[in-house]
């Protein structure tokens, strides 16, 4: 299999962020490197929690209908990209295609 295209940075507070540290994601079937991804620090984790808390302040007052529409759109995107997600799962975990599709 060829390398799957996927973001390799952290997504915190609505922004893609690179980190000074990274690690390799390895295909367990042949130990080939699939990607090199950003390695989050403790501070990155704290920043993500803060960003999520801040976003909740807005999300919690967003009308239910609008929240439902956003979640529905997220579902539609995830469904449309199910094969891409399954491919990443199969590559990273060495899962059979059927099992990987079952997780999407």
Language model segments and positions:
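Terminal low-complexity tails and localization/encapsulation signals of metabolic enzymes
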Residues: 1-36, 69, 73
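Glycine-rich loop-to-alpha-helix module at the N-terminal edge of alpha/beta enzyme cores
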Residues: 32-104
